[in-house]
Amino acid sequence: GQVMLLPKDPSTPVIMVATGTGIAPMRAYIRRFFVEDIPSWNFTGLAWLFMGVANSDATLYDDEFQECVKRFPGQFRVDYALSREQNNKKGGKMYIQDKVEEYKDQVFDLLDGGARMYFCGLKGMMPGILSMLEGVCKEKGINYDEWLEGLKSNGQWHVEVY
């Protein structure tokens, strides 16, 4: 649906957060940005994928993503949260919200600059994501409810979970 449409401005940074089969639309975005030749839409922004899976054997399309990292080093990055192989800063399992939190300053700077953030995958990731973002807002002295509402009203917040 319209919830997951890409920005019209091809210079807009895009932060993608996916778990499991939620990688499907993110892969389509990445292919649109870096593989398909679309003269009318030449992506010039940053595309940053956070992918949460149980272990490295479950990193779908990693070969494609690593090729994009090599071909577009300043424009594409991918970070994995491997819950059965990595630990978070508290020593627990590394979930998607923990991986995003590792880069909280960069993520917040990008969002402050107009980046779009897309979430797709298991609905169980969203409570952890929202709780983490609320904690980061508190650390930064930001009113969380106003901040999140601002992202939504500015068209920067896109969620498709199931």
Listing of model-derived features with the role each one plays in the protein:
Residues 1-5, 34-162:
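Reductase modules of NAD(P)H-dependent flavoproteins
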Residues 9-35, 125:
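Active-site beta-strand/loop microenvironment that shapes enzyme catalytic pockets
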